[in-house]
Protein backbone atom coordinates (compact mmCIF):
# COMPACT_ATOMS: atom_id res chain seq x y z
CA UNK A 1 0.00 0.00 0.00
CA UNK A 2 1.33 3.41 -0.93
CA UNK A 3 0.77 6.20 1.59
CA UNK A 4 0.72 9.74 0.20
CA UNK A 5 1.80 12.53 2.55
CA UNK A 6 1.21 16.20 1.73
CA UNK A 7 3.22 18.40 4.10
CA UNK A 8 4.55 21.94 4.09
CA UNK A 9 4.31 25.24 5.95
CA UNK A 10 1.07 26.83 7.03
CA UNK A 11 -0.91 28.57 4.26
CA UNK A 12 1.06 26.79 1.52
CA UNK A 13 -1.99 25.07 0.01
CA UNK A 14 -1.82 21.59 1.57
CA UNK A 15 -5.58 21.17 1.89
CA UNK A 16 -6.27 22.15 -1.71
CA UNK A 17 -3.60 19.81 -3.08
CA UNK A 18 -4.67 16.93 -0.82
CA UNK A 19 -8.28 17.28 -1.98
CA UNK A 20 -7.22 17.46 -5.63
CA UNK A 21 -5.12 14.30 -5.22
CA UNK A 22 -7.92 12.54 -3.33
CA UNK A 23 -10.39 13.26 -6.11
CA UNK A 24 -7.92 12.15 -8.75
CA UNK A 25 -6.78 8.97 -6.97
CA UNK A 26 -9.95 7.95 -5.16
CA UNK A 27 -8.46 8.83 -1.79
CA UNK A 28 -9.42 9.87 1.71
CA UNK A 29 -7.57 12.46 3.78
CA UNK A 30 -6.06 11.92 7.22
CA UNK A 31 -5.39 15.15 9.12
CA UNK A 32 -1.86 15.64 10.47
CA UNK A 33 -2.27 19.18 11.81
CA UNK A 34 -2.05 19.32 15.60
CA UNK A 35 -4.16 22.50 15.70
CA UNK A 36 -7.10 21.00 13.81
CA UNK A 37 -7.76 18.23 16.33
CA UNK A 38 -9.61 20.68 18.63
CA UNK A 39 -13.38 20.87 18.50
CA UNK A 40 -14.87 24.32 18.04
CA UNK A 41 -11.63 25.94 16.88
CA UNK A 42 -12.36 26.05 13.18
CA UNK A 43 -11.63 29.51 11.80
CA UNK A 44 -8.42 30.09 13.75
CA UNK A 45 -6.94 26.76 12.64
CA UNK A 46 -8.00 27.02 8.97
CA UNK A 47 -9.82 23.73 9.37
CA UNK A 48 -11.25 22.33 6.12
CA UNK A 49 -14.67 23.81 5.43
CA UNK A 50 -17.85 21.80 5.05
CA UNK A 51 -17.51 22.19 1.28
CA UNK A 52 -13.92 20.89 1.35
CA UNK A 53 -14.91 17.96 3.56
CA UNK A 54 -17.66 17.18 1.10
CA UNK A 55 -15.16 17.05 -1.75
CA UNK A 56 -13.18 14.25 -0.05
CA UNK A 57 -13.65 12.29 3.19
CA UNK A 58 -11.54 13.67 6.07
CA UNK A 59 -10.37 11.85 9.21
CA UNK A 60 -8.87 12.92 12.58
CA UNK A 61 -10.47 16.34 12.80
CA UNK A 62 -12.31 17.50 15.96
CA UNK A 63 -10.87 14.81 18.22
CA UNK A 64 -10.49 16.60 21.57
CA UNK A 65 -11.80 19.59 23.48
CA UNK A 66 -9.66 22.73 23.87
CA UNK A 67 -7.37 22.23 26.84
CA UNK A 68 -7.17 18.45 26.41
CA UNK A 69 -3.93 16.80 25.40
CA UNK A 70 -3.01 15.11 22.13
CA UNK A 71 0.51 13.80 21.66
CA UNK A 72 2.35 12.31 18.70
CA UNK A 73 2.05 8.73 19.95
CA UNK A 74 -1.73 8.97 20.27
CA UNK A 75 -1.97 10.65 16.89
CA UNK A 76 0.09 7.90 15.24
CA UNK A 77 -2.14 5.20 16.73
CA UNK A 78 -5.30 6.95 15.53
CA UNK A 79 -3.77 7.60 12.12
CA UNK A 80 -2.74 3.94 11.80
CA UNK A 81 -6.35 2.90 12.39
CA UNK A 82 -7.71 5.48 9.93
CA UNK A 83 -5.19 4.46 7.25
CA UNK A 84 -6.01 0.77 7.71
CA UNK A 85 -9.71 1.53 7.28
CA UNK A 86 -9.11 3.56 4.13
CA UNK A 87 -6.95 0.83 2.62
CA UNK A 88 -9.54 -1.81 3.51
CA UNK A 89 -12.09 0.16 1.48
CA UNK A 90 -9.76 0.01 -1.52
CA UNK A 91 -9.00 3.73 -1.41
CA UNK A 92 -5.76 5.71 -1.21
CA UNK A 93 -4.81 7.20 2.19
CA UNK A 94 -3.54 10.77 1.91
CA UNK A 95 -2.05 12.31 5.05
CA UNK A 96 -2.17 16.12 5.00
CA UNK A 97 -0.77 18.49 7.58
CA UNK A 98 2.18 20.54 8.67
CA UNK A 99 2.90 19.17 12.15
CA UNK A 100 6.31 17.62 11.62
CA UNK A 101 6.26 15.67 14.87
CA UNK A 102 3.01 13.97 13.85
CA UNK A 103 4.31 13.12 10.39
CA UNK A 104 7.55 11.76 11.81
CA UNK A 105 5.75 9.68 14.44
CA UNK A 106 3.53 8.18 11.75
CA UNK A 107 6.32 7.42 9.29
CA UNK A 108 9.13 6.45 11.69
CA UNK A 109 7.66 5.71 15.12
CA UNK A 110 7.90 7.55 18.43
CA UNK A 111 10.60 7.89 21.05
CA UNK A 112 10.18 5.82 24.20
CA UNK A 113 10.36 8.50 26.90
CA UNK A 114 10.11 8.43 30.71
CA UNK A 115 6.65 8.55 32.25
CA UNK A 116 5.03 11.68 33.63
CA UNK A 117 6.03 13.09 37.03
CA UNK A 118 2.96 14.74 38.63
CA UNK A 119 4.97 16.39 41.42
CA UNK A 120 7.53 17.92 39.05
CA UNK A 121 4.77 18.95 36.66
CA UNK A 122 2.85 20.72 39.43
CA UNK A 123 5.99 22.51 40.62
CA UNK A 124 6.84 23.73 37.12
CA UNK A 125 3.29 24.87 36.44
CA UNK A 126 3.30 26.78 39.74
CA UNK A 127 6.61 28.40 38.79
CA UNK A 128 5.16 29.42 35.42
CA UNK A 129 2.14 30.98 37.14
CA UNK A 130 4.40 32.86 39.57
CA UNK A 131 7.32 33.90 37.35
CA UNK A 132 5.94 33.54 33.83
CA UNK A 133 6.32 30.88 31.17
CA UNK A 134 9.62 32.28 29.83
CA UNK A 135 11.23 31.47 33.20
CA UNK A 136 10.33 27.78 32.83
CA UNK A 137 11.47 27.85 29.21
CA UNK A 138 14.82 29.22 30.42
CA UNK A 139 15.19 26.10 32.57
CA UNK A 140 14.80 23.99 29.44
CA UNK A 141 17.29 26.13 27.52
CA UNK A 142 19.84 25.51 30.27
CA UNK A 143 19.60 21.71 30.05
CA UNK A 144 18.67 21.18 26.39
CA UNK A 145 19.23 24.23 24.14
CA UNK A 146 18.20 22.32 21.02
CA UNK A 147 14.83 21.37 22.52
CA UNK A 148 14.32 24.94 23.72
CA UNK A 149 14.91 26.15 20.17
CA UNK A 150 12.18 23.82 18.88
CA UNK A 151 9.57 24.64 21.54
CA UNK A 152 7.95 28.05 21.90
CA UNK A 153 8.29 29.67 25.39
CA UNK A 154 4.50 29.96 25.64
CA UNK A 155 3.95 26.26 24.89
CA UNK A 156 3.98 25.33 28.56
CA UNK A 157 2.70 21.79 28.01
CA UNK A 158 5.62 20.84 25.77
CA UNK A 159 8.18 22.76 27.86
CA UNK A 160 7.09 20.94 31.01
CA UNK A 161 7.10 17.58 29.24
CA UNK A 162 10.63 18.21 27.96
CA UNK A 163 11.81 19.00 31.49
CA UNK A 164 10.10 15.85 32.78
CA UNK A 165 12.05 13.83 30.22
CA UNK A 166 15.32 15.57 31.09
CA UNK A 167 14.76 14.80 34.78
CA UNK A 168 14.85 11.11 33.83
CA UNK A 169 18.55 11.36 33.02
CA UNK A 170 18.61 11.97 29.25
CA UNK A 171 17.50 15.12 27.49
CA UNK A 172 14.81 15.03 24.80
CA UNK A 173 17.44 15.79 22.16
CA UNK A 174 19.58 12.87 23.32
CA UNK A 175 16.60 10.52 23.13
CA UNK A 176 15.68 11.73 19.64
CA UNK A 177 19.27 11.33 18.46
CA UNK A 178 19.44 7.78 19.85
CA UNK A 179 16.14 6.84 18.16
CA UNK A 180 17.36 8.32 14.84
CA UNK A 181 13.91 7.72 13.25
CA UNK A 182 15.40 5.27 10.75
CA UNK A 183 12.46 2.85 10.72
CA UNK A 184 10.09 3.23 7.78
CA UNK A 185 6.65 2.22 8.99
CA UNK A 186 5.00 2.90 5.62
CA UNK A 187 5.86 2.91 1.95
CA UNK A 188 5.28 6.65 1.71
CA UNK A 189 5.52 9.32 -0.96
CA UNK A 190 6.28 12.48 1.00
CA UNK A 191 5.48 15.73 -0.80
CA UNK A 192 6.35 19.09 0.76
CA UNK A 193 4.93 22.29 -0.67
CA UNK A 194 7.55 24.97 -1.21
CA UNK A 195 6.10 28.32 -2.32
CA UNK A 196 8.42 31.34 -2.59
CA UNK A 197 8.86 33.02 0.79
CA UNK A 198 7.35 36.35 -0.26
CA UNK A 199 4.30 34.57 -1.66
CA UNK A 200 3.94 32.47 1.49
CA UNK A 201 4.16 35.50 3.78
CA UNK A 202 1.56 37.32 1.70
CA UNK A 203 -0.76 34.31 1.95
CA UNK A 204 -0.21 34.09 5.70
CA UNK A 205 -0.95 37.79 6.20
CA UNK A 206 -4.11 37.59 4.10
CA UNK A 207 -5.27 34.42 5.84
CA UNK A 208 -4.84 35.97 9.30
CA UNK A 209 -6.87 39.03 8.31
CA UNK A 210 -9.57 36.73 6.94
CA UNK A 211 -9.57 34.78 10.21
CA UNK A 212 -10.17 37.92 12.27
CA UNK A 213 -12.92 39.02 9.88
CA UNK A 214 -14.45 35.57 9.57
CA UNK A 215 -15.04 34.29 13.08
CA UNK A 216 -11.80 34.01 15.06
CA UNK A 217 -12.99 36.64 17.52
CA UNK A 218 -16.24 34.73 18.06
CA UNK A 219 -14.30 31.53 18.75
CA UNK A 220 -12.01 33.37 21.18
CA UNK A 221 -15.05 34.89 22.89
CA UNK A 222 -16.52 31.41 23.37
CA UNK A 223 -13.24 30.24 24.90
CA UNK A 224 -13.18 33.22 27.27
CA UNK A 225 -16.70 32.38 28.41
CA UNK A 226 -15.85 28.72 28.88
CA UNK A 227 -12.50 29.15 30.64
CA UNK A 228 -13.22 32.09 32.92
CA UNK A 229 -10.04 33.56 34.37
CA UNK A 230 -7.41 31.75 32.31
CA UNK A 231 -7.37 30.19 28.86
CA UNK A 232 -5.78 26.75 28.48
CA UNK A 233 -1.98 26.82 28.32
CA UNK A 234 -1.85 25.20 24.91
CA UNK A 235 -4.05 26.77 22.26
CA UNK A 236 -3.50 27.18 18.52
CA UNK A 237 -1.81 30.36 17.32
CA UNK A 238 -4.06 33.41 17.36
CA UNK A 239 -6.52 32.65 20.13
CA UNK A 240 -4.55 34.30 22.94
CA UNK A 241 -4.10 37.45 20.84
CA UNK A 242 -7.76 37.51 19.83
CA UNK A 243 -8.79 37.11 23.47
CA UNK A 244 -6.41 39.91 24.49
CA UNK A 245 -8.10 42.16 21.93
CA UNK A 246 -11.52 41.28 23.31
CA UNK A 247 -10.31 42.21 26.81
CA UNK A 248 -9.11 45.58 25.53
CA UNK A 249 -5.43 44.72 26.00
CA UNK A 250 -4.55 44.93 22.28
CA UNK A 251 -6.05 47.01 19.52
CA UNK A 252 -7.22 45.06 16.49
CA UNK A 253 -4.33 45.93 14.19
CA UNK A 254 -1.74 45.00 16.81
CA UNK A 255 -3.48 41.69 17.47
CA UNK A 256 -3.52 40.94 13.73
CA UNK A 257 0.15 41.90 13.38
CA UNK A 258 1.22 39.64 16.25
CA UNK A 259 -0.66 36.68 14.85
CA UNK A 260 0.81 37.25 11.39
CA UNK A 261 4.32 37.28 12.88
CA UNK A 262 3.60 34.14 14.91
CA UNK A 263 2.36 32.28 11.84
CA UNK A 264 5.40 33.33 9.80
CA UNK A 265 7.70 32.04 12.54
CA UNK A 266 5.71 28.83 12.73
CA UNK A 267 6.01 28.39 8.96
CA UNK A 268 9.78 28.79 9.24
CA UNK A 269 9.97 26.10 11.93
CA UNK A 270 7.83 23.78 9.79
CA UNK A 271 10.19 24.16 6.82
CA UNK A 272 13.27 23.58 9.01
CA UNK A 273 11.68 20.42 10.40
CA UNK A 274 10.83 19.07 6.96
CA UNK A 275 14.31 19.79 5.60
CA UNK A 276 15.65 17.39 8.23
CA UNK A 277 13.32 14.64 6.99
CA UNK A 278 14.72 12.24 4.42
CA UNK A 279 13.05 11.36 1.15
CA UNK A 280 11.10 14.61 0.77
CA UNK A 281 10.03 15.78 -2.68
CA UNK A 282 9.76 19.58 -2.55
CA UNK A 283 6.98 20.82 -4.81
CA UNK A 284 6.91 24.41 -6.04
CA UNK A 285 3.70 25.96 -7.41
CA UNK A 286 1.86 25.63 -9.69
CA UNK A 287 0.97 22.01 -8.96
CA UNK A 288 0.36 19.62 -11.85
CA UNK A 289 -2.11 17.33 -10.09
CA UNK A 290 -2.23 14.81 -12.93
CA UNK A 291 1.57 14.42 -12.99
CA UNK A 292 1.77 14.25 -9.20
CA UNK A 293 -0.97 11.62 -9.13
CA UNK A 294 1.09 9.39 -11.39
CA UNK A 295 4.29 10.14 -9.55
CA UNK A 296 3.14 9.29 -6.02
CA UNK A 297 1.85 5.87 -7.04
CA UNK A 298 5.00 4.73 -8.84
CA UNK A 299 6.63 1.76 -7.06
CA UNK A 300 9.80 3.71 -6.33
CA UNK A 301 9.49 7.33 -7.46
CA UNK A 302 13.13 8.34 -7.94
CA UNK A 303 12.66 11.90 -6.70
CA UNK A 304 10.82 10.73 -3.60
CA UNK A 305 12.60 7.59 -2.42
Swiss-Prot record:
GO MF terms listed in the record are: ATP binding; tRNA dimethylallyltransferase activity
The region called Interaction with substrate tRNA is annotated at 33-36
SUPFAM superfamilies assigned to the protein according to its UniProt record, in alphabetical order: P-loop containing nucleoside triphosphate hydrolases
Q: Which UniProt keywords apply?
A: ATP-binding, Magnesium, Nucleotide-binding, Transferase, tRNA processing
Q: Reaction catalysed by this chain?
A: adenosine(37) in tRNA + dimethylallyl diphosphate = N(6)-dimethylallyladenosine(37) in tRNA + diphosphate
Q: Recorded E.C. number(s)?
A: 2.5.1.75
One GO biological process term: tRNA modification
The Swiss-Prot or TrEMBL record lists the needed cofactor(s) as: Mg(2+)
Checking InterPro entries in the record gives: Dimethylallyltransferase, IPT, P-loop_NTPase
Which residues does this entry assign to the site Interaction with substrate tRNA? 99, 121
Highest taxon of the lineage: Bacteria
Residues binding ATP are: 8-15
Which positions are annotated as binding substrate? 10-15
| Assembly and interaction partners | Monomer.
Q: Which family does it belong to?
A: Belongs to the IPP transferase family.
NCBIfam families given in the database record: miaA (TIGR00174)
This chain's function reads: Catalyzes the transfer of a dimethylallyl group onto the adenine at position 37 in tRNAs that read codons beginning with uridine, leading to the formation of N6-(dimethylallyl)adenosine (i(6)A).
Q: What protein does this entry describe?
A: tRNA dimethylallyltransferase
Give the organism, scientific name.
Anaeromyxobacter dehalogenans (strain 2CP-1 / ATCC BAA-258)
